[in-house]
From Swiss-Prot:
Swiss-Prot/TrEMBL GO biological process terms: proteasome-mediated ubiquitin-dependent protein catabolic process; protein polyubiquitination; transcription-coupled nucleotide-excision repair
Gene name, Swiss-Prot/TrEMBL: ckn1
Protein name: DNA excision repair protein ckn1
Assembly: Interacts with ddb1.
Function: Adapter protein for ddb1/cullin 4 ubiquitin ligases involved in transcription-coupled nucleotide excision repair.
Subcellular location: Cytoplasm
Chief location category: cytoplasm
Amino acid sequence: MNSFLLAREWGQEPNSSFRRQLLQHRLQRLALNPDVKIKRRHGAGILGSVNALSIDNTIHQLMVSGGANSSINVWDLQNIDQKEDEDLILDTLNAVPARTSHKFGITDLHWFPFDNGIFTSSSFDHTLKVWDVSTLQEAYTFTMEDMIYSHAWSPIASHCLIATAYRSSSIRLCDMQSGSYTHSLSGHTGNVLAVDWCPKNEFVLASGSADGTCRLWDIRKVSSSFACMDLHNKYLPSNQTNISHYGTVNGLAWTSDARYLASCGTDDRIRVWNMESGRNTLREFGPIIHNQTTSFAVHPCMIQPSMDSDVFVLFPNDDGSLALLNLLEGSFVRRLSTHSLKRINCAAYRPDFEQCFTGDMNGNIYMWSPKALKSPTKISDLETRRNIIQEVYDSLINIPVTYQ
């Protein structure tokens, strides 16, 4: 890092390069923040588990959490930014008590991409609800035939479609403007657990299923998927019988430029797909992924500090740890641990603030931030310290000289 500072002073490195390296360095120093404690607000015992977290997409100030006891809590993260004391206990801003709206556990939460006044929640009770944050009242409710594993908004779309993955081999599209369903996407042969919209094309949707396939859809067409990823790269993506994982595909995440799609499955593997060719990049992260979740979708945190920087992934593991990975290099960076054997159910990254929040089976929400470097010693402190060498020297020169 000192070499970058020196190069910047000499004008040898552009500011963007220095900023990129600084952000990546800080990301690699993520650690539990001991100064911020977040109150447990989702009950006790097994029903106190935190199943979902989401941070608003506009100013990154509000966070919503959902528990296994069906409660929903809204948190104001600005209190963290404005804290003056060393220790802060963060409490909820508003809450939906257990069993007052959803009847069973929350499975997924997402903010409306263009407004932090709306968020959505899905549950084991077969419903998808749209919420008004100011009143914390339901605006719409969509009811499915079975439990909902996950759902997703498009980050760029002109439409207001919400893709839902529920205990079915098809994907249901819900239109928030009309309050009704538009159509279903059929092609999987097992339950669909994960869905995620392409960040560059508002009509392209990715899905992952218990049949071991990761598929791409054009929602303007009612036909089957236009691509099915092949982990062996033997067949073209147009082959509908390809296999993507040796197990259930339970998580998906796009890079911000949509050039790559990451999928994770119960085979304890993360695969990185090149979206220009549809081929498996064959990135291997080693035996550090522990992922056997089939109750709801896993949401890996895709982190790219700047458009020209490396892409990192924070992956919540079943063993209570977070794995920090360099996605395109296929390398393991470091393991972040809460010293608990209870699995981390969810993780949410707060852009521009370099903070990460995680929720676990114990009902805890933790905050992670770059570990602070030790402050350099002040000159004033050095001046007040006892200088033994100087004292010895002074004592020697002050000895009177005598002549025999």
